[in-house]
Each structure stands twice: as structure tokens, then as C-alpha cells.
């Protein structure tokens, strides 16, 4: 991973126009007539149309391509609870990624509120502005209540990306990794180390794809989450095991086919990796330091399939290959939600793309001559421009088929062609 100095990072954000995003007009504005259309008196006409038919906001405003990136700064990357304002650079960065990868406009909104109920009310009050809401960096367990309530009480897509983005990308990677090693998800034994928002969402999604609950062991900072424990919340209790033979990570890893780490760095050692089943799969997703490094895992078990959150090793789990395209597809059909069928469609589309021949420009971006589906490539790269077409169209189709779309797509070939050019605009 390229080393970045503190001063380089500060200069990047400060020099020129401070920050990373700006508002750009989309209509002519050079003449007095243009301005009279953009504002008074011409602006009254779309206002009156929207008053009569609220859905016309999608016709006359940018609502249909606008997402709010909303955070209270209570769980910012590896920084923890740094507060709403200090989290603003991260939210601006998320907005930048929405635009460059998905062509989605977004406003970053930092809400200085820790109380879940008051936070929910703030988001509901500003929701009419947006076509979708991306919740970001909100600590568990409050994030579960906040997302659940907002999904139920708003008629636009709401997604907490820290939960579902990680789950979707890792699930796509898991399905492909299992194919490479010749195992079925229904048969594997899995260890999930971590029980926060991302870990809970990952486990739920894996189960929906066939993982058996009895084959899953989840751990938090106090050890295995078991039915015998009385110190666990309702989200953790959902994954409590009744096994009495495992109490520690070392015991849980013995004979496991899959390890998914969403915890802290350097918690897995070589002996644990050696104790795993034949051709084990390790997703060490703690950032910036994974639970075990790629080199250490490979040294312990040359047959391991490995994924991390880092760019300098194969098979990076990176949410940017998910959220811009999930929201793109949801916005394009004016969806009222991002539901399970849409998330599952994203998983399948991402997994399928990795199995297709890879364009030369993708391999060259990583200094490689070629990329071929297998142990060192089972997750698409973020620079792959096919993602916007495949994932967005899959999500849009799932929204229509599951009944949450308010705007149909009549010509799928034309839609896919438009997606292919969108990020070039």
C-alpha cells in the first residue's frame, strides 16, 4: 500500500478549493432569461406541479439522482467516535466516490446527535430532498435501530453501507472463493470474528445464500457468542451457538473452512491458520491492519484463499464496487427501498462479473499483464467500468420484480448502454 504522509493528506484537502466536492449547475444560466427560468418567476411552475403531484419532484428536480450521505460521526473508519464535524472529510470522500463511480450526486450531512430517536427525526425531516439515504459511520447497536426505523418510515431507499456494502461484496467474494476451492456454502464451517454492524449483516446475508446456522460460530471481544452467555444484545443472540466445545478463537478456527474477520489486526496467528480445513478461505477485513497479513497466511497455508481490505494484495473487499451501483439502480427506477432481493441481485452480479474475461485496462491498472478468475482473482477490481452496467441493471431489475420500483425500464438494452456512458460524462 502506498505510504501517504500526514502533510500530503492535509495538503490534498486544503489546497485550491478546500474539501473534495462542489455543486455544479446543470441548466443554462448565462442570460437574464435563463435566470428567470431557474428562479423567479419561472420556478413557480414546477413548484405548483409538485404540490399537485409529489412524485413529479423526480421530473423537475434532482431528487432522482441525489443521495444524502448522513453520519453522526460515532464510528468513523478506524478513528471511532470523533464527532459529526470531524467525520466530514470521510463523508465528502464518500460523496466523491458516489459521483465518480456511479454518476450519483450527493450531499454530505453531518448530524451532531447521539440519541437514536432524535437522529431519526432529523433524517426524516430532511428526507424529501433526496432520492436515497446512505447512512455512514454510525456505531452499533444504534445503527440497527436507526436503519430499521428509517426504512420503515420513509418511501425512499435507505442503506447503512457499513453493514450492507461489506456484506454484499464479501458475499460475492465468498461464493466465488467457494467455487474455486470446490466447496458448497451449505457444507462449510464458518467463523466470523467480530459482532458489530458489518459482521451481523455479513452473517445474515451468508445465511440467505445457504450457510447453515449450525455451521456458524461468531465471536466478539469476550469470546464465542453462545446461548449460555447473558451479556449479549438481541443482534448477537441471533447468532448464538449452543455448542459447548468452543470458547476461544483458537478453538473455533480448528477445522473451519472459512474465517471472516471484522475485528482487529493481528488477532489470528499461523497456528490457527494451519488448524483450518483443507483449502481454507480467509477474509481478514480489519483495517488498516488485517487480522493476519496476506504473507503470513500464505506462509502458514500455501493453499489458502485470502482476501483483505487492502489494495496491495489480491482480492480486496472494497465497498466501492457496491454502493455506487446499488444506489444507481435503485434511483433509476425510483425505488421505495433497497430490499433483500436487490442486495442479493448485487451479490450475484458482482460474483458473475469476476468470472468473465477481464479487459486489459483493468489488469494494466494494477501492473499486471492479465487477470484470470481463480485463487488470486475472484472479486472484480474497482476500476472495472463494467460494474456500473452489470450491478446497476441487476439491482434495478430486482427492484421492479420485487415490487418496490415506481418507474419501469422499458428498454433494457438502451438502459445498459446509457449506464456504460454515464461515468464518462
Language model: regions and residue ranges:
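Solvent-exposed alpha-helices and their adjacent loops that cap or buttress functional pockets
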Residues: 58-63, 99-100, 125-127, 151-152, ...
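Rossmann-like adenosine-cofactor binding region
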Residues: 237-305, 310-312
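N-terminal ligand-binding/catalytic initiation module
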Residues: 1-158, 392, 397-408, 422-425
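Adenosine-phosphate binding glycine-rich loop
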Residues: 161-162, 181-183, 284-409
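Short, ordered loop/turn segments at secondary-structure junctions
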Residues: 72-74, 82, 111-112, 137-140, ...
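General beta-strand structural signal in soluble alpha/beta enzymes
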Residues: 108, 134-137, 158-161, 192, ...
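Glycine-rich phosphate/diphosphate-binding loop of Rossmann-like nucleotide-binding domains
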Residues: 77, 82-102, 154, 160, ...
Amino acid at each position: 500500500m502506498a505510504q501517504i504522509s500526514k502533510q500530503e493528506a492535509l495538503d490534498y484537502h486544503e489546497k485550491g478549493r478546500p474539501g473534495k466536492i462542489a455543486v455544479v449547475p446543470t441548466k443554462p444560466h448565462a442570460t437574464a432569461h435563463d435566470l428567470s427560468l431557474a428562479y423567479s418567476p419561472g420556478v413557480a411552475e414546477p413548484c405548483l406541479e409538485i404540490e399537485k403531484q409529489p412524485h413529479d419532484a423526480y421530473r423537475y428536480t434532482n431528487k432522482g439522482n441525489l443521495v444524502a450521505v448522513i453520519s453522526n460521526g460515532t464510528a468513523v473508519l478506524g478513528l471511532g467516535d470523533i464527532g459529526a464535524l470531524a467525520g466530514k472529510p470521510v463523508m465528502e470522500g464518500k460523496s466523491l466516490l458516489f459521483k465518480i463511480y456511479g454518476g450519483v450526486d450527493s450531499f454530505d450531512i453531518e448530524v451532531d446527535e447521539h440519541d437514536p430517536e432524535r437522529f431519526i427525526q432529523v433524517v426524516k425531516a430532511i428526507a424529501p430532498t433526496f432520492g436515497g439515504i446512505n447512512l455512514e459511520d454510525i456505531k452499533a447497536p444504534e445503527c440497527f435501530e436507526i436503519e430499521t426505523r428509517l426504512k420503515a418510515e420513509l418511501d425512499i431507499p435507505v442503506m447503512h453501507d457499513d453493514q450492507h456494502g461489506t456484506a454484499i461484496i464479501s458475499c460475492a467474494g465468498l461464493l466465488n472463493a467457494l467455487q474455486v476451492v470446490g466447496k458448497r456454502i451449505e457444507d462449510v464451517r464458518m467463523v466470523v470474528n467480530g459482532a458489530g454492524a458489518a459482521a451481523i449483516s455479513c452473517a445474515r446475508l451468508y445465511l440467505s445464500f445457504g450457510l447453515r446456522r449450525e455451521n456458524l460460530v461468531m465471536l466478539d471481544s469476550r469470546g464465542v457468542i453462545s446461548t449460555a452467555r447473558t451479556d449479549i444484545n438481541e443482534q448477537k443472540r441471533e447468532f448464538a451457538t449452543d455448542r459447548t466445545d468452543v470458547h476461544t478463537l483458537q478453538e473455533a478456527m480448528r477445522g473451519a473452512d472459512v474465517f471472516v474477520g471484522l475485528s482487529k489486526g493481528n488477532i489470528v496467528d499461523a497456528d490457527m491458520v494451519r488448524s483450518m480445513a483443507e483449502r481454507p478461505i480467509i477474509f481478514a477485513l480489519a483495517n488498516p491492519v488485517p487480522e493476519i497479513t496476506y504473507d503470513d497466511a500464505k506462509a502458514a497455508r500455501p493453499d489458502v484463499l485470502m482476501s483483505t481490505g487492502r489494495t496491495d494484495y489480491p482480492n480486496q473487499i472494497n465497498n466501492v464496487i457496491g454502493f455506487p451501483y446499488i444506489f444507481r439502480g435503485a434511483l433509476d427506477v425510483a425505488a421505495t427501498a433497497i430490499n433483500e432481493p436487490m442486495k442479493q441481485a448485487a451479490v450475484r452480479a458482482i460474483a458473475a462479473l469476476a468470472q468473465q474475461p477481464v479487459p486489459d485496462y483493468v489488469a494494466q491498472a494494477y501492473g499486471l499483464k492479465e487477470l484470470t478468475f481463480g485463487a488470486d482473482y475472484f472479486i472484480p477490481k474497482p476500476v472495472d467500468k463494467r460494474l456500473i452496467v452489470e450491478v446497476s441493471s441487476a439491482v434495478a431489475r430486482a427492484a421492479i420484480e420485487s415490487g418496490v420500483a415506481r418507474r419501469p425500464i422499458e428498454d433494457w438494452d438502451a438502459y445498459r448502454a446509457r449506464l456504460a456512458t454515464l461515468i464518462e460524462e
